Amino acid sequence: MATTTRRSTIGLALAGGGPVGGIYEVGAMAALAEALDGLDFNEFDIYVGVSSGAFIAAAVANRLAPSSLARMLVEDDTEEVFDPEMLLRPALGEYFRRALSVPVLFWTALRQYLSDPWHLRLIEAFQGLSHAIPTGVFNNAGIDQLLRRLFSSGGRSNDFRQLDHRLFIVATDLDTGESIPFGAPGYDDIPISVAVQASAALPGLFPPVLVGERYFVDGALIKTLHASVA
């Protein structure tokens, strides 16, 4: 009696490491694809990405070959080019929102101090002003904008549910510290580009990304590689 052999599930998990780490991952995949006959990174079953690895995983899951990504990231000879300067744009909206909160925070602190000046130290009363400090210096919304354009053509999709392969983008819930795998059931209804933006929102450098009613930051805060998600 003939027997059939069930093919094992193959997954690709990509870690963080900033722009340099992402370029390294793309270069390694492009080199392996060229050296090993039959190796096609676009035909894996599962893709998991975190931080800069989220950008690469989302692109490869959308059938962008490592060689094409290399040209986009390094050689600048494609229509869509990743410009690192887009990550260095000031978070002006964040600055403005925080500046608007200063008067309210100041008068609240002053009122609190004057209500009990004998027992409340001045520094304790005014510590609430720390909420006016911006949560990020730069704006990483360019990631969302670039990926939206990239995934809107060539048969690609910005919807987890429309991909041919499973994709998980890991980000960290700012309030609970929980690692959330976007793309899993219950977390697959947001755009892939927004999930990648959230996964790469390094605290202090970029503001948290609001998804629904929750704020998310860099998925590498808990661990840099989330292969177990697969």
What are these regions (language model features)?
Residues 1-50, 55-230:
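Patatin-like phospholipase
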